[in-house]
């Protein structure tokens, strides 16, 4: 039922152990996740062997969050293309997939100009969010859960971050929220293209 779907999207990947814990969470719970990869962080190669089967099955989708997390509105056309291309190359070389068409601009920094430059290289869907775990910085489990309670609702794209370990202590409570609300999780591919979308290159 499309009406009861929420898309949980996880950005950055500063902390490799948090990415690893998210993979356990996905394997143990069946939750479907979209990672917006910031390619310069080692977590995306550190966790390759564990992540690849989940990417292959489509339970986890990988999308582009640039190489070094700059505000795209401060860059030239060449700078934007370089940031996206380096991350795209990582996704292709490490996982055999493309991140296109989904780009999430760091800090939400976008304009009609940045959108048009991204589209030139296949990144036609600038993906923002409606709701956040609030965990781009360090916060307490109680605050994070409060944000999860507030935003894990049908038809929402919710943003979290793989940067600090707080979220890893509340996975059980996140599952409880999803079950209480009869919510199904979906990747962006599930929502935009339907199950089984092939992003192999």
Which functions belong to the PLM regions below?
Residues 34-36, 61-63, 104, 126-127, ...:
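Structural detector of well-ordered beta-strand residues that form the stable sheet scaffold
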Residues 1-71, 79, 83-93, 97-100, ...:
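Active-site beta->alpha N-cap acidic-glycine motif
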Residues 109-151, 183-195:
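His/Asp/Glu-enriched short active-site or ligand-binding loop at hydrolase and phosphoryl-transfer sites
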Residues 77-82, 142, 165-168:
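Non-membrane alpha-helical structural segments and their capping/turn regions in soluble enzymes
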Residues 21-25, 49-50, 113-117, 170-174:
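A short acidic, amphipathic alpha-helical/loop segment
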Residues 1, 29, 42-43, 166-201:
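C-terminal domain-boundary segment and adjacent tail
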Residues 13, 38-40, 67, 106-108, ...:
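Active-site beta-loop-alpha junctions enriched in small/polar residues
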């Amino acid at each position: 039922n499309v009406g009861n779907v929420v898309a949980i999207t996880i950005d950055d990947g500063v902390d490799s152990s948090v990415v690893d814990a998210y993979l356990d969470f996905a394997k143990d719970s069946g939750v479907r996740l979209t990672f917006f990869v910031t390619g310069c962080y080692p977590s995306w190669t550190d966790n390759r062997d564990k992540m690849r089967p989940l990417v292959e099955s489509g339970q986890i989708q990988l999308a582009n969050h640039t190489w070094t997390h700059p505000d795209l509105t401060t860059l030239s056309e060449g700078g934007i293309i370089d940031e996206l291309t380096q991350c795209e190359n990582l996704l292709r070389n490490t996982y055999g997939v493309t991140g296109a068409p989904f780009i999430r601009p760091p800090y939400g920094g976008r304009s009609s100009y940045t959108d048009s430059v991204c589209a030139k290289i296949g990144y036609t869907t600038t993906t923002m969010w409606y709701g956040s775990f609030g965990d781009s910085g360090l916060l307490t489990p109680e605050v994070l859960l409060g944000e999860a309670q507030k935003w894990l609702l049908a038809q929402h794209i919710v943003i979290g971050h793989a940067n600090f370990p707080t979220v890893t202590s509340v996975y059980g409570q996140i599952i409880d929220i999803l079950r209480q609300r009869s919510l199904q999780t979906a990747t962006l591919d599930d929502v935009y293209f339907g199950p089984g979308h092939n992003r192999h290159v």
